[in-house]
């Protein structure tokens, strides 16, 4: 028996019949914990525990959770834990694929009808062989590669962190180029909690993805300059 928490996406037709399902614990790596260990533990579950605000979780604590039978909306790794926390699903009709936003992996991920990952828009840290090759390469406006390491990138490019609403902008996209808008909440940005909570910020961001070259360019962002006053750890718009 396998316990699951929001790690199966089910496609249902207008008559309520199941057409297909995407079992994320088989498609992705439910043991990638790089992001989960850096999240604010006061803002990871449906039942928010304010007493844990500002705290992170250790590898030992994650391992202990895996030994427990207390399944439910509990952050952690492994099938049955809240390791994916998918909060949006969009559809790309050009190749019959879905685009998911996985909050607890801090990644937008495109998955084909064949259940294979097409690309991953997120920090490369922690992705094992088979997934690492699918992580998009950031580039600047001239197409030159941008160096990224330990969750941080050179220049103005940034990944999204604990994001929501990764949506394809249909009127600007085609089969080769996908324009993606994302609400970047920003918790665990750069795979760490800042020294001061007031350093956190939320932003809206638009990316241009070249699906043939497997590159991503950041086209636009708003919110970074507004700072912590507009930071939203859980909510999206």
Language-model segments: residues:
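Asp-box/WD-like beta-propeller blade repeats and closely related beta-sheet repeat scaffolds
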Residues: 1-43
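Beta-propeller blade signature
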Residues: 3-15, 196-211
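Short, ordered coil/turn segments that flank beta-strands lining enzyme active or ligand-binding pockets
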Residues: 14-15, 94, 113, 212
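Beta-propeller fold detector
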Residues: 19-27, 31-34, 118-133, 216-222
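Beta-propeller domains
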Residues: 28, 55-200
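Internal, charge-rich low-complexity segments
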Residues: 29-51, 128-139
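Conserved blade-ending motifs and adjacent loop-strand segments that build the rim/top face
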Residues: 217-233
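Conserved small/polar residues in nucleotide/adenosyl-binding loops
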Residues: 235-237
């Amino acid at each position: 028996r396998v316990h699951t928490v929001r790690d199966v996406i089910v496609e249902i037709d207008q008559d309520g019949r199941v057409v297909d399902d995407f079992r994320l614990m088989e498609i992705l790596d439910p043991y990638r914990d790089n992001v989960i260990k850096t999240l604010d533990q006061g803002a990871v579950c449906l039942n928010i525990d304010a007493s844990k605000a500002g705290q992170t979780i250790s590898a030992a604590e994650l391992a202990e959770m895996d030994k427990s039978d207390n399944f439910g909306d509990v952050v952690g790794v492994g099938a049955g834990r809240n390791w994916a926390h998918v909060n949006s699903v969009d559809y790309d009709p050009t190749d019959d694929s879905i685009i998911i936003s996985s909050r607890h992996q801090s990644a937008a991920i495109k998955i084909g009808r064949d259940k294979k990952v097409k690309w991953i828009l997120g920090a490369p840290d922690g992705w094992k062989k088979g997934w690492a090759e699918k992580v998009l390469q950031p580039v600047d406006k001239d197409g030159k590669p941008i160096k990224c390491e330990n969750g941080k990138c050179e220049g103005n490019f940034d990944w999204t962190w604990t994001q929501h609403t990764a949506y394809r902008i249909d009127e600007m996209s085609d089969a080769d180029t996908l324009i993606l808008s994302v609400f970047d909440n920003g918790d665990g940005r750069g795979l760490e909690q800042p020294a001061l909570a007031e350093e956190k910020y939320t932003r809206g961001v638009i990316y241009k993805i070249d699906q043939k070259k497997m590159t991503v360019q950041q086209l636009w962002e708003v919110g970074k300059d507004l700072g912590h006053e507009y930071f939203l750890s859980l909510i999206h718009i």
